[in-house]
Each structure stands twice: as C-alpha cells, then as structure tokens.
UniProtKB/Swiss-Prot annotation:
Catalysed reactions, as listed in the record: Endohydrolysis of (1->4)-beta-D-xylosidic linkages in xylans
Stated name of the protein: Endo-1,4-beta-xylanase
Lineage of the organism: Eukaryota, Fungi, Dikarya, Ascomycota, Pezizomycotina
Main enzyme class: hydrolase
Pfam families hit by this protein: Glyco_hydro_11
Biological pathway: Glycan degradation; xylan degradation
GO molecular function, one term: endo-1,4-beta-xylanase activity
Organism: Trichoderma harzianum
Residue intervals of the GH11 domain: 1-190
Protein family: Belongs to the glycosyl hydrolase 11 (cellulase G) family.
Positions annotated as active site in the UniProt record: E86 (nucleophile), E177 (proton donor)
Key words, A-Z: Carbohydrate metabolism, Glycosidase, Hydrolase, Polysaccharide degradation, Xylan degradation
PROSITE patterns: GH11_1, GH11_2, GH11_3
Length: 190
C-alpha cells in the first residue's frame, strides 16, 4: 500500500514517513515488516518500519537492497523523550558521511564492525514534539552493509559511557533517509 506522510501500523509493525514537503518520494508498506521507497530530486525525507515504542535492548534484523545516489542513510533510527534525543545507528550511507564536521567521542565494536560515535545538536528543528532544540546521537558503521542484525544495547551502552543518555523510548525503526538525492530501497525488518 502506497501512502502519504504520516505514522501508523502495517501488518503488526509501526511505520513512520516524514518529508519536508519538497521530497519526490513514493513510500509503500509491504507484507510483514517490509517496505519500499523510491525517491528522486528529493528534499529531505525519513521513512521506515519498526516498533512503537522501541526498547533499549532489541536485536533488530534487516535485509534487502539499498541503492542511493547522493546523500542518504540506512539506519536504525528513533527518538527518546526526557531528554529529547534523535538517534541513528547508521549501517550504510551514500556519498555523504553524516558525521562530517562532528566531533568523534569514541567507538564501539558490534555485529562485525567498528562504529564511530558522535554527538551533534539541532537548533529549532522538527522533532516528535514539534520544533525544538535537541541532541542527535550517532553510531556510524565503518563496514557498510544493507542486511544484518543490530544489537542496539551495545550502542546505547557505549553512548552512555560517553555521557550520551537516552530517556523514555519513543518509536524505533529501520529507516531510509534522503536529502536532495535519488535512489531506491526495499527493506524487510524483524
């Protein structure tokens, strides 16, 4: 089922699809935890499937194809409240490393790769509570992949060791994000 921006449930999984109003995106919910997204000449969008709420110890499995042209990420993506945090465990990305310009805080080895840990800040930007100022936490995988398993606790514990704490978990999805780029992805989450 091809849908417009919004959130809801599809075949037992939570989905979230957001765009900035300038994104040429087609997002489709498939069976189970599957979804597809195609985009071209897009603005900014984030779309994917997972859980609401997420947890701090979930092992997330994902598989499929991811073919970006330009600035795009394939991530475990979510939010917490109190504190308001947007977080990414980046498994793959296109031409732009999302950590560019950020200060590296450390690294963690998990699920067959080293991930570099960063924190960035967003000022007066969209969030799950409306326009707000908040931190973003990042783990960026060095060995890119489009299928695998992610032990989220390894990342959250590593972040906490650097003072990056999460609050009450909100949604947690496997997400494709694009920023003024094009591409296609077909992902299944479990």
């Amino acid at each position: 089922q091809t849908i417009g921006p919004g959130t809801g449930y599809s075949n037992g999984y939570y989905y979230s699809y957001w765009n900035d109003g300038h994104a040429g995106v087609t997002y489709t919910n498939g069976g189970g935890g599957s979804f597809t997204v195609n985009w071209s000449n897009s603005g900014n969008f984030v779309a994917g499937k997972g859980w609401q709420p997420g947890t701090k110890n979930k092992v997330i499995n994902f598989s499929g194809s991811y073919n970006p042209n330009g600035n795009s990420y394939l991530s475990i993506y979510g939010w917490s409240r109190n504190p308001l945090i947007e977080y990414y465990i980046v498994e793959n990305f296109g031409t732009y490393n999302p950590s560019t310009g950020a200060t590296k805080l450390g690294e963690v080895t998990s699920d067959g790769s080293v991930y570099d840990i960063y924190r960035t800040q967003r000022v007066n930007q969209p969030s799950i509570i409306g326009t707000a100022t908040f931190y973003q936490y990042w783990s960026v995988r060095r060995n890119h992949r489009s299928s695998g398993s992610v032990n989220t606790a390894n990342h959250f514990n590593a972040w906490a060791s650097h003072g990056l704490t999460l609050g009450t978990m909100d949604y947690q999805i496997v997400a494709v994000e694009g920023y003024f780029s094009s591409g296609s992805a077909s992902i299944t989450v479990s």
